[in-house]
Amino acid sequence: MASGPSVFLLNVSGQIESAEFPEFDDLYCKYSFVYGHDWAPTSGVEEGISQITSKSQGGKQALVWNFPIEITFKSTNPFGWPQIVISVYGPDAFGNDVVRGYGAVHLPFTPGRHARTIPMFVPESSSRLQRFTSWFMGRRPEFTDPKVVAQGEGREVTRVRSQGCVTVSFNVVTKDLKKLGYNTGSGDFPNATTMSQP
């Protein structure tokens, strides 16, 4: 007698499509996945770095990367559902690479194609003296580990400033979630076009 599945799978492919940073140009991004203890990547790439892109000449002036992402996870429970953390970098006035934004978003729960716009932020110096010193030395405040963005610990005392946004598209496939008793809501509701009208 065959037993049921003991894990479920989450496969995500897609791309880091573009960004809007009105004040900056010639940016690149790094991404990594953050997930709970019960999760394990089974295939794909956990972190990567994109090419440098310049603003398009059109009216929107978007920074287009179209950088592919693909990863498969296995888990026994949804606690610690994976998040993608994106860090954007670019040159400052002195040519030093500095962080231009951090952001994170959970991978979508439901199968299908999804697009997410991630608001980005940067850490701020807490005093004018620190701000001047960091500008003069060419070292702006940044996280030693960008994955801290996906965690809540210590974030309440971090001073940040909103700056730009990044658009990411996801294609999500799940396997055996329903067999383990987890309902993501997909496919459980009748299609509005096939419902009978009173």
Swiss-Prot record:
It is found in: Cytoplasm, Cytoskeleton, Cilium basal body. Keywords: Cell projection, Cilium biogenesis/degradation, Cytoplasm, Cytoskeleton. It comes from the Eukaryota. GO terms for biological process: cilium assembly; smoothened signaling pathway. It holds the Pfam family B9-C2. The keyword Cytoplasm applies. Residues 8-126 form the C2 B9-type domain. InterPro entries: C2_B9-type_dom (IPR010796). One of its GO terms (cellular component) is cytoplasm. Component of the tectonic-like complex, a complex localized at the transition zone of primary cilia and acting as a barrier that prevents diffusion of transmembrane proteins between the cilia and plasma membranes. Required for ciliogenesis and sonic hedgehog/SHH signaling. PANTHER family: B9 DOMAIN-CONTAINING, B9 DOMAIN-CONTAINING PROTEIN 1. Part of the tectonic-like complex (also named B9 complex). Belongs to the B9D family. This is B9 domain-containing protein 1. It comes from Xenopus tropicalis (Western clawed frog). The gene is b9d1.
